Amino acid sequence: MFQGETAITVDDKGRMAVPTAYRDLVARVSGNRLVLTYNPFEAGCLWLYAEKEWERVRDDVMSKPNTQRVVRTLQQKLVGSSAVLELDANGRLSIPASHRNAVGIEKKAVLLGMGDKFELWSEQAHRALIQQTLSDGDLGDELLDLRL
C-alpha cells in the first residue's frame, strides 16, 4: 500500500503535508483520516495507520491480558497515546505537540511508507537508523535466505 521515503517539513503549528502521491490513496482507504501513535520499538519514530488497519492493530493489542507489564506498556504506547488526525483541505496533518516533542520532531522529518502504515521519523533518528548496518548475526534464520 504505502512505500517510499519523503523528506517532510513541519511548520510552526505542527502541520506536515502528506505527499501528493499518497493523498488519493489515504482518501480512498481511510476517508482522509489517519491514526497516529508511538512506535513502541524505536525511539524517534511515530506510526500513522489508515483507520481500518488501525482498528485491527488496536483490537489485537487490546485483546492481550494486561497482567504483564510489557503488555500494559504496549497498550499505553499504542492505544492510550493514539490520536485520530484528519487531512485538511491542503492535504496537511496536524501532529500534536506532545507526540512531536516525545520523538524529537522539530522542523525536519522523514516519512517512510511501510506497507500497511507510515513511519514518521525525526530527521536525526532516521539518519542514525540509515547509518546502522546489519550483519548475518542480526538476521534470524527465516531472513538468511532472503534475496535482496
Curated annotation (Swiss-Prot):
This is Transcriptional regulator MraZ. It comes from Xanthomonas campestris pv. campestris (strain ATCC 33913 / DSM 3586 / NCPPB 528 / LMG 568 / P 25). GO terms for cellular component: cytoplasm; nucleoid. The keyword Repeat applies. Its main location: cytoplasm. The gene is mraZ. It is found in: Cytoplasm, Nucleoid. The keyword DNA-binding applies. Forms oligomers. Belongs to the MraZ family. CDD domains: MraZ_C, MraZ_N.
